[in-house]
From Swiss-Prot:
Name this polypeptide is given: Autoinducer 2 import system permease protein LsrD
Biological process terms in GO annotation: autoinducer AI-2 transmembrane transport; quorum sensing
Species name: Escherichia coli (strain K12)
Lineage, broadest ranks: Bacteria, Pseudomonadati, Pseudomonadota, Gammaproteobacteria, Enterobacterales
Places the protein is found: Cell inner membrane
Membrane-topology descriptor: Multi-pass membrane protein
The encoding gene: lsrD
Length: 330
């Protein structure tokens, strides 16, 4: 295997070590069915993190996806409550997610303002819209909208060939986004845009169209996550995506993406999602409080990112150490 997959292999090895270590504490962690079906608790983070990787590779960022999930979730509930057939309500919810992404892209392209600032604004815009819809539907505060058909609420809890449906959808997204980013001309354009937007523009690369596609895909993935979460919990709430921001960005960075753009890996992000998700699961099964598990997750991110930085710059570090050895301080 080529050296460029070295980081992904290191993450995979770390994932195996993590599972074995938690399995030594609690043998249930080594049960295959438990490992597969526990992914339903966190795999929606991965569904959003995959297209987010491409946005970050392009030199942008989107921190509004959590609010997009909440808006799409409550919109699905309101549509169903209003008598819209469930298939049509799901389709309209997916279109709403893509529209949220296009709003982000349009504001970024035409205002030339930093994507972090724009998506911070839309984060509050979409969150406020979700609360407004929730209030209009009579679901005050964070009270959910329920009463969905059993066929819909069972969907996210089904399994096909022994695999839970949310995990299957994640694997399909993984394949599609990996092929698009790493095996197509359009995907190569994303890397070029992240490395130098000006050069990409002068090279006749459709920068604006590419950015619209990337942010729309992130919005669409957020809507898919919203539909799965509503099905999984049986309730549409405006706060469903509130806790997704940091885990998703952590997975993208941990997976090898450069936060300044120009490099990243879909496979790396996918493995990092499992790494972070199983870390939380393992700590909970070990009886560790949530506050401590969050701190440990942050510590893991710091250690791994520092390790990756050392790995990437090991030649410069060796040269610096050699110079210090030859010229010791008095």
């Amino acid at each position: 295997m080529r050296i460029r997959y070295g980081w992904e292999l290191a993450l995979a090895a770390l994932l195996v070590i993590e599972i074995v270590a938690f399995g030594a504490i609690n043998p249930r962690m080594l049960d295959l069915n438990m490992l597969l079906f526990s992914t339903s608790d966190f795999i929606c983070i991965g569904i959003v993190a995959l297209p987010l990787t491409m946005v970050i590779v392009s030199g942008g960022i989107d921190i509004s996806f959590g609010s997009t999930i909440g808006l799409c979730a409550i919109a699905l509930g309101v549509l169903f409550q209003s008598g819209v057939p469930m298939p049509l309500a799901i389709l309209l919810t997916l279109l709403l997610g893509a529209l949220c992404g296009l709003i982000n892209a349009g504001l970024i392209i035409y205002t030339k303002v930093n994507p972090l600032v724009i998506t911070l604004g839309t984060l509050y815009l979409f969150a406020g819209s979700a609360l407004l819809l929730s209030g209009m539907a009579g679901a005050t505060g964070y009270e959910g909208i329920g009463g969905f058909p059993m066929a819909f609420t069972d969907f996210a809890n089904l399994d096909v060939l022994g695999l839970p449906v949310p995990l299957i959808i994640f694997l399909i997204c993984l394949l599609v986004f990996w092929l698009w980013l790493h095996k197509t001309h359009a995907g190569r354009n994303v890397f070029l845009i992240g490395q130098s937007p000006r050069v990409a523009l002068y090279s006749a690369i459709p920068v604006n169209r590419t950015l619209c596609a990337l942010y729309a895909m992130t919005g669409l993935a957020s809507a898919v996550a919203a539909v799965l979460l509503v099905s999984y919990f049986g309730s549409a709430r405006s706060d469903l995506g509130a806790s997704f921001l940091m885990p998703a960005i952590t997975a993208v960075v941990l997976g090898g993406a450069n936060i300044y753009g120009g490099s990243g890996s879909i496979i790396g992000t996918a493995i990092a999602v499992l790494l972070v998700g199983y870390l939380q699961q393992g700590l909970q099964m070990a009886g560790v409080p949530n506050q401590v598990s969050s701190a440990l997750s942050g510590a893991l991110l710091i250690v791994v990112v520092v390790g990756r930085s050392v790995s990437l710059h090991r030649q410069q570090i060796k040269e610096w150490l050699a110079r210090r050895a030859n010229n010791p301080l008095p």
